[in-house]
Amino acid sequence: AIVTKPKPEALPFWTESLDKVIADVASKTTDDANKILIDNKPEDAMPLLIKLAAKKQGDERNAIIARFLLTAEHTATSGDLMYLLLRDADELTTDDYIRQRIIVALGYTHCPQAISYLRKYYGNKAYADALAVATTELIAYQPEANAGRMVSAMLYAAKQSYIHHYDEKDVDTRIDQVLAAIDNWHAEGGYNMAHTEVTRMEKRGFWVIHDQLADFNLAFDWLSEGTLTLSIRSMPVLMFNKEKGLKLVGDSKWHKYDTIGDWSTANISVNGDNITVSVNGQKLIDGTKLVATESGDPINKQGYIKFLADEQGATVREYCFLRK
């Protein structure tokens, strides 16, 4: 009789052992961090943990960031807010295991800003596996971002990573996912990430990005104590203010949004003459008609994007756009 050997039990996917390391580091959390978790809902505790971590050093800081990562798994915080918190955590940690866990978590934020931010870890061996998981997840949820040379390189690197882990659980599903993404990739299109660097505007400073845009998606983070005005199609359209909220230029109503730290992040979509805006994951303007500020003027059909700071100055980062 032919004896068929039982198929060996698949090893757990590598992230499981990473999770154990993170849980172990988190178990050494200091009393002041534990008190934050006892006194606050998880959503409210997360930014407080990041603030506390910034005041600590070495192992104490890493323990708090690890605890933050475990807490983040059990909250309904929007992907955009989570992206901002994870970036702060990434800037604070020096630990490779924690950074891998942050990179994986950034994949599950499903925002274009995260794709732009994570490019800096491409080609770094220590983070190749984490970046594979993040890239696959980000592109699966944003097929419109699946274009351009950088995304292609990240997808091929993800495929290589999964091949190295071929004997682990559910890797075939991940490989199928990444192969499908590679099949659906386009050379042209996707998010233009040529202007993602941190750009500081001093008092009443401005930044014009000269690409002529008609219909598009736009994402960026900003930091300002005052009001930041955004021109779209070469016309002032939106005003952002941390205290008051967001409003359309020429409108009196401010739309409040939640903040969790110094930075906020926006996603804007313009289709025809209608605009939709989300800030920190909250949709505040939904398909509202663009109106030319000088009454009676027709709306520009295309134009540049311009950021204008007030007396307080402003900083913008991770500016990326997708033409439609």
Predicted regions and their residues:
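Buried hydrophobic core positions in alpha-solenoid tandem helical repeats
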Residues: 14-22, 48-50, 81-89, 117-119, ...
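Structural detector for internal amphipathic alpha-helices that build alpha-solenoid repeat scaffolds
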Residues: 1-12, 20, 29-42, 51-54, ...
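Helix-loop junctions that connect tandem helical modules in alpha-solenoid scaffolds
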Residues: 24, 92, 161-165
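Carbohydrate-interacting regions of secretory-pathway proteins
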Residues: 173, 180-324
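Disulfide-bonded cysteine-rich modules in secreted/extracellular proteins
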Residues: 17-25, 191-196
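Mid-chain, structured segments of secreted extracytoplasmic proteins
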Residues: 59-77, 142-145, 193, 221-224, ...
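Beta-propeller blade termini and top-face loops
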Residues: 71, 124-128, 133-137, 244-245, ...
